[in-house]
Design a protein with these regions (language model features):
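Short, surface-exposed binding/anchoring microloops in extracellular/periplasmic proteins
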Residues: 57-97
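Solvent-exposed serine/threonine-rich low-complexity stretches and specific carbohydrate-binding patches
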Residues: 95, 106-120
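Exposed aromatic-hydrophobic patches
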Residues: 121-131
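Solvent-exposed strand-loop boundary residues in beta-sheet-rich modules
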Residues: 101-103, 147
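Hydrophobic/tyrosine-rich beta-strand signature of extracellular beta-sandwich/beta-rich modules
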Residues: 139-141
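N-terminal prepro-regions of secreted/extracellular proteins
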Residues: 1-69
């Protein structure tokens, strides 16, 4: 009889543990990040994106990187880098900085710049920007690398 009671008690504890784990997983998955035009709205200190597909890279381009990070109160740091598979005649990184407009549920461009270089396989560009607090910001880049015009 004692074994039977211990067996039932052990089974009950195991069942309660399984139910508790399941409840924890359900509540954790409820924190979905909102995605707007391919970008997740997050409060992380830093976010980095890379070229997503080998098809987008072409013959010369190996990798493209875009990074945004907090750089103090009311400041962000925007960074873009382009890497080629080999030395190319022309390379450029076009960096766009956008702010999320919650009222219209869309991104609006607040800054952009172009960095160019020749006869290289790597380049990067960065800028620190003063921004208004209370908004979401993102950085995205166009990466160009080639040997013949048009690139």
């Amino acid at each position: 009889m004692r074994r039977r009671i211990l067996s039932i008690l052990g089974s009950t504890v195991l069942l309660c543990g399984i139910v508790a784990m399941s409840a924890t997983n359900v509540s954790a998955s409820g924190k979905e990040l909102k995605q707007v035009d391919g970008s997740y709205l997050t409060t992380e200190e830093r976010s980095t994106g890379y070229t997503s597909s080998p098809d987008l890279r072409g013959v010369h381009l190996m990798d493209g990187e875009s990074t945004i990070s907090k750089a103090g109160i009311s400041r962000i740091y925007a960074y873009g880098a382009t890497t080629a598979n080999h030395k190319v005649k022309y390379m450029a990184t076009i960096v766009y900085v956008d702010r999320y407009d919650e009222k219209n549920d869309e991104w609006g461009q607040i800054d952009a710049w172009v960095a160019e270089d020749e006869n290289t396989y790597y380049m990067s560009t960065a800028k620190s920007l003063k921004v208004e607090r209370g908004y979401y910001y993102r950085v995205h880049c166009n990466h160009i690398a080639g040997n013949e015009y048009p690139y």
